[in-house]
Amino acid sequence: MTGLFITLEGPEGAGKSTNRDYLAAQLRAQGVQVLLTREPGGTPLAERIRELLLAPSDEGMSADTELLLVFAARAQHLAEVIRPALARGEVVLCDRFTDATYAYQGGGRGLSHERIAALEQFVQGDLRPDLTLVFDLPVEIGLSRAAARGRLDRFEQEGRAFFDAVRSTYLNRAKAEPARYRLVDAAQSLADVQASLDKLLPELLELQRG
């Protein structure tokens, strides 16, 4: 059985991790084998790269350095976690994947689509998510939620224009490839967001059955 690769995307404060865990519980209740993971991270080495990417520092990080670190972590994550799980026939639920790179390093940092796409092909080959859930909400709501969590990481400290570009990139990618993306209104209450996920569950189960 071939596995199913589902990614959850969205800006800061969109509730991706919480809703990833909820979706996993719903799938497991139907007898589905689910693996939860995240990017950057997912393996001990990739988590160390995550720390480099997120920790505020007195030394600035160039956009190219950031991009290469993201894909270095992704290469390790794919080799050690994602590809083996898919080969076992599991459903992989991943908090962020390459759409986040296009949104943050492309939209936010201004790196070209072509540069990101070249690394995407090099690291991933033909592997792409089967389905991507984009948790969308206004920037000001997301930043307010992120601030309420406490100390901000290096990305969360960016300004409004950065996150406007991140959001626009996500929405444009979803519009360009509607077969792969599902938009979820993350500005709703948690109960309403999870009700939206419940409505998606039959589609996910059908995809998993092939």
UniProtKB/Swiss-Prot annotation:
Enzyme Commission code(s) on record: 2.7.4.9
Keyword Kinase appears in the UniProt entry: yes
A molecular-function term among this protein's GO annotations: ATP binding
CDD domains: TMPK (cd01672)
Sites where the protein binds ATP: G10, P11, E12, G13, A14, G15, K16, S17
Uppermost EC category: transferase
Gene3D superfamilies: P-loop containing nucleotide triphosphate hydrolases
Keyword terms, alphabetized: ATP-binding, Kinase, Nucleotide biosynthesis, Nucleotide-binding, Transferase
Gene Ontology BP terms: dTDP biosynthetic process; dTTP biosynthetic process; dUDP biosynthetic process
GO CC term (a single one): cytosol
Matches recorded under Pfam families: Thymidylate_kin
Reaction(s) the record says it catalyses: dTMP + ATP = dTDP + ADP
NCBIfam families: DTMP_kinase
Role, per record: Phosphorylation of dTMP to form dTDP in both de novo and salvage pathways of dTTP synthesis.
HAMAP family documented for this protein: Thymidylate_kinase
Family statement: Belongs to the thymidylate kinase family.
Protein name as it appears in the record: Thymidylate kinase
Taxonomic source organism: Pseudomonas syringae pv. tomato (strain ATCC BAA-871 / DC3000)
Gene assigned in the entry: tmk
